[in-house]
């Protein structure tokens, strides 16, 4: 014990002073089974006991010292987890104990969850140190489930849905890939995955046509398929059944508004057209003769760049029945729904050549065509039907560049031709086809809806890139054959609006048939009438670039003479010697200048329906435009003029809602026979009431807030600035209306606006905040009465302004003099106020100076007394002896204070040393008690072990 105490004392003596109460360690040994007995010292060494690996017991012998990094954990296991040591260090000084023989643990332990009380036996401190190892082997037998699909019998209905059989790579049995189902009337399934089947060696039926059910909602979104060439055989009966099944689908894209947005014009072949030959209404909208291998996805058709193709339609044989309606419906047709995707499609440059070789055209043939979808009839039709067999050829023009690049190209060299007529894009085309059997067809666009007709004309006016060329032979109209060659070329630039790029012009052959003699006489008289319209616009036609020429048709002169009385007409003077006097460039600039002047005249007169374009009187009325011309040459328009006209048309379209409303009104009036009267009345009222409406609107906006206190009218003062060309004849001068005293005859009883608002505008119920109805009536009557009174006063002032004009200058001078006097008085008062402020400041400064002088005077009177006090203060207060005495007293006092402080420090040091000694004594006593407690615990443990041995002996016995 003495050696251990000395050792601890040497350890506790450290160089730095530490608080011993803080470094005391809790050396109490836990009595629970989870804690082990160990003791930690202040050095980096651990004391452990030797462990007998063979016997599994701890040897009570001299401990072994290990380093700190190889210490044991709190549960007794080392870091290497190879041994289990007991950290009990009691009995170091006792005699070594011989190792015990290994005794097997005979007790049983239930590890089940139900008998949870047995769990505590794991931590029983009385049990033996033998380690019990439990090994649990769980043997699980897994069942291997192998699933595969066997062959489905051929005739069952489940063969259509056997999709899993396609992916069965283990079973090499033959899989039924038939999509028919084996039953009559069943729908065919689009077995797309059969293409990728590696196990199927049989040919796959790729016919994906589905018979349209009665109520098929999703059928709207399906694209119609084209049968393969192997199935298109007219001799086979099965092929005809498949064709009839494929044609059972509704291919009319105009009947469904939703399909019009998703279907492409190039989705049907000529075979599908042949199946509808027994139908009277042959709606061939969007049908293009395309091979099956060239058919692409309908969705990608929206993004394709259109190709310029030339489609030639030749009538070879057969007769057209009277009830055949070859209608190609597009945007221009008011009966058809709107094609949503049509505005995003780029129109193709196509050339249609219609040559009539034989046969007769019946009276009721309606061939309405739009340029959105080109008609291509069927090439093969059976003879047992009365349909027309037409030959369809499609050629691609060589050398045709992109439509978009045509905008940026330089204009070609212009070549002047003796052509006469001028054709504008905004004009309505009326063409006459003269037949040898004295039958005249008038081709006119006459929609049923007048409002839609006016909007269609507006869209026609926005077409800026269309060139119309008419080729007509010089033969006599009576001896010419029934052959008309018409070429139509579209050249729409990509820089225009989508609406303008969609060509909505519709050309019809009406049902009214006229005689050839009447048509010839009308055309001959048309050149002699003053309504003859002709103008020359020339440009060079480049082969392969400009394409073919446009169509211009001659209109019926009777319709011109009838419409000229009820609507404005285009009068264009022909320049016969244009080719000799001016070149192509000057001629083009002249036409551009005329079009610009037309736009300026429209903007100045605010009449978009009436445009004057030339000194001779070029007048265009988009609501009803007619053209009469006898074509004898080729006319074309250069690209520059088209671009200039496009800019002009875009500027004219800025007021399209207003013009469309006017045209709608005029169209409605024209049905009742009052178009000319309504137009004349509109123009007259607009010219007369242009400024009157402005003044009325200003007076009505003032309302009940207008009173006598309101002076000049700002809007009336700015009348000359707002419209210098149209000054009101009744508007008085603002100065006169201000200076002239009001006449008692037109005096209005003054009122207070606040009182009126309180009396008449107070709601009956403050919670509901609903005003009295009489308040609104009073406000309306008051505003109307006051506006009338002001008008009468202004009229009277204007009538007597001549008499007052002589005294006006004098009154103005008096007013100016009075204003000058008021200004002078204001300046005088301002000057007086500033002078008063300056004088007050000077007075304050003088008073402060006077106070300072008074104080100085008082100080000068007490000067002698002050000098005596200064002298006394300047004299020394202490002598040398007194100063030394005071210094000595100071030093003595300081020494006494230092001595007292030193004595206090010594007493405190002695007290501190006493406390330290007492603390050391207490620490030693505590250590002794701890050692005694440890010995007692060791003895108690040994007694418990003896008791356990006795109990085991009893149990063994």
UniProtKB/Swiss-Prot annotation:
| Coiled-coil regions listed | 830-950
Q: Where is the composition biased (Polar residues)?
A: 91-106
Q: In which broad location class does this protein mainly occur, judging by the first location in its UniProt entry?
A: cytoplasm
Q: What is this protein called?
A: Outer kinetochore KNL1 complex subunit knl-1
**Function recorded in the entry:** Acts as a component of the outer kinetochore KNL1 complex that serves as a docking point for spindle assembly checkpoint components and mediates microtubule-kinetochore interactions. Kinetochores, consisting of a centromere-associated inner segment and a microtubule-contacting outer segment, play a crucial role in chromosome segregation by mediating the physical connection between centromeric DNA and spindle microtubules.
Q: Which domain of life is it from?
A: Eukaryota
This protein's gene is called knl-1
Q: Source species, please?
A: Caenorhabditis briggsae
Q: Which intervals of the chain are annotated as region Disordered?
A: 89-111, 476-504
The UniProt comment on domains reads:
The N-terminus contains a number of repeats which contribute additively to bub-1 recruitment to unattached kinetochores. The repeats are not required for localization to kinetochores.
Question: What molecular function does GO assign, one term?
Answer: microtubule binding
